[in-house]
């Protein structure tokens, strides 16, 4: 059997663990020299591939240099927000597959979130339509943890660890004065509140801050919010509140839109930011207390200092498992995680039909949110805590800073 080449790409927002999945794919592929010749990377995803920007991993990261991917945040290959046309009759598809043929590609891997799985779905369906034998698989990635048919996704654990740690640090900072104050922390999450829920992991004891946590899975009422903040002063004169960027009222209007309209991205998703600042001003004007807001922003997804060992190892495992599955002939699938136990925590990799995953969204179960919508339950804590475990020792360079790997 003649050898073929494998190509991998990254797409969407980066995470602290997306390069671990890339490492898993590349390192496993390099072991199978009897079947796989070259291992290529698409620079800036499908968009870059269409423009002819490709690298050869054996040349770009030879030998032990490849390992540095496992502690490097961001997306080593670069990313894109390119949306493939809905119609498989569009000329971009034969163009892509002609390029695959020219490069002798036998296996295609795309590492990303929901929109990336949409790409995997379209490419695998087109391959089936034309009778191509290219095996096309998706590697999950998203800090939002909103991919369906998987217990969780690589990237979420590290982002959740960052959120919990940062909320604990902000709480310590907020509580230095014996004077009423409210600190509102705005956390990523448009429709799914997994990351914001992780703020509950910051608590050291019952009644500790954050005293209020609001997710987008439930309706947000401004007046009820003000009442709860006022009541929270009975527990602590310094109240920390965590809110998802996508909290909305009963009519579906985002709270951030109370001040201004939100724009949209290439996939039609609203770009949200600003609910924390709105609530800060509201608390200050209505309750007459010191108030401030903190937007965690992109730091949630790029902190190598908070890279969770569990997250890193599962990212690598997913990459390795995917290559093994592809070599066994699997295609049109996404690598998924199936939890086997909470304590001690254990999981295994499985394969799921990517067509049942793309364009769907997994939200926090309503039964994991308190009835009044201002906190998460113990079930959420039990689910999330194992995912933030483990410390990764990131090598330090001569300049005293993390020794990340950079694409040249």
Predicted features by range, described:
Residues 257-408:
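C-terminal non-catalytic interaction/assembly regions of soluble proteins
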Residues 5-15, 75-81, 106-112, 138, ...:
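Short glycine-rich or small-residue beta-strand-to-loop segments that form or flank ligand, phosphate
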Residues 2-9, 69-82, 141-151, 178-181, ...:
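Gly-rich Lys/Arg/Thr-decorated short loops/hinges at beta-loop-alpha junctions or inter-strand turns
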Residues 44-47, 141-145, 187-192, 216-222, ...:
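Glycine-rich beta-alpha junction loops
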Residues 99, 107-112, 118-133, 153-292:
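Accessory alpha-helical/coil subdomains and C-terminal extensions
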Residues 15-25, 49-50, 93-94, 114-122, ...:
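Short glycine/serine/threonine-rich phosphate/pyrophosphate-binding segments
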Residues 52-106, 115, 156, 168:
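Glycine-rich oxoanion-binding loops at beta->alpha junctions
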Residues 1-54:
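N-terminal phosphate-binding or glycine-rich loops at protein starts, especially the Walker A/P-loop
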């Amino acid at each position: 059997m003649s050898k073929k080449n494998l190509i991998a790409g990254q797409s969407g927002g980066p995470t602290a663990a997306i390069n671990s999945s890339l490492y898993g794919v590349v390192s496993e592929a390099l072991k199978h020299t009897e079947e796989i010749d070259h291992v290529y990377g698409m620079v800036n995803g499908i968009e870059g591939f269409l423009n002819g920007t490709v690298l050869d991993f054996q040349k770009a990261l030879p030998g032990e240099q490849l390992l540095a991917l496992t502690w490097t945040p961001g997306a080593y290959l670069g990313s894109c927000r390119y949306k493939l046309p809905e119609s498989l009759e569009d000329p971009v598809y034969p163009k892509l597959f002609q390029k695959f043929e020219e490069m002798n590609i036998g296996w295609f891997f795309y590492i990303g979130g929901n929109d990336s799985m949409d790409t995997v779905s379209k490419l695998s369906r087109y391959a089936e339509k034309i009778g191509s034998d290219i095996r096309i698989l998706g590697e999950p990635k998203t800090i939002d943890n909103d991919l369906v048919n998987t217990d969780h996704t690589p990237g979420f654990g590290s982002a959740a660890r960052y959120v919990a740690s940062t909320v604990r640090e902000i709480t310590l900072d907020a509580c230095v004065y014996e004077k009423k104050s409210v600190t509102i922390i705005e956390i990523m999450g448009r429709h799914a509140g997994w990351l914001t829920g992780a703020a509950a992991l910051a608590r050291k004891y019952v009644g500790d801050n954050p005293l209020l946590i609001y997710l987008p899975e439930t309706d947000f009422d401004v007046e009820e919010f003000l009442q709860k903040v006022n009541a929270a002063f009975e527990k602590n004169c310094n109240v920390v509140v965590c809110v998802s960027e996508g909290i909305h009222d009963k009519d579906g209007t985002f709270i951030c839109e109370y001040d201004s309209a939100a724009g949209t991205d290439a996939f039609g998703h609203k770009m949200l930011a600003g609910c924390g600042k709105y609530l800060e001003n509201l608390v200050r004007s209505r309750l007459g207390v010191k108030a401030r807001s903190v937007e965690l922003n992109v730091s949630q997804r790029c902190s190598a200092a908070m890279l969770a060992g569990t997250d890193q190892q599962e990212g690598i495992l997913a990459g390795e498992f995917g290559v093994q599955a592809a070599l066994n002939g699997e295609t049109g699938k996404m690598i998924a995680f199936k939890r086997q136990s909470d304590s001690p925590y254990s999981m295994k990799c499985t394969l799921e039909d990517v067509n049942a995953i793309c364009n769907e969204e997994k939200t926090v179960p309503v039964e994991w949110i308190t009835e009044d919508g201002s906190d998460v339950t113990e079930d959420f804590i039990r689910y999330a805590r194992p995912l933030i475990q483990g410390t990764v020792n990131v090598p330090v360079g001569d300049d005293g800073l993390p020794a990340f790997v950079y694409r040249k």
